[in-house]
């Protein structure tokens, strides 16, 4: 539902979007490309599951990973900024989190960090969803991100 609303807003305003994903492993971009006509608003995705790819493809600083970890608001902000630079889009969405089964970097299972950059403004989000199965959490993460992106687009349009 949210992906369709996002698509309508992007198409109406002739905006483009891209995603940089870690914890969702491509599910976020898949949700957007499920919409017919996605090629008119969706530029692409970088699934940077490893820290090496976060650094090399998205320009995440080594110091950020050491000081704050990959599952942090600092990392997803740098991922979103790197995505904007690499893919030259109007809207960049980046996410990282913990889907389990174990905690990671002192973050509990269900922790989600994401950043949305639109109109040169960055919106940072941190949430904790109830623990569930790994795949349930990843789906919930995607829904939370899409809901938030749709809300941001509603506010600015």
Curated annotation (Swiss-Prot):
Protein known as: Protein MG115 homolog
Source organism superkingdom: Bacteria
Species classification: Bacteria, Bacillati, Mycoplasmatota, Mycoplasmoidales, Mycoplasmoidaceae
Annotated InterPro entries: CinA-like_C, CinA_C
Family the UniProt entry places it in: Belongs to the CinA family.
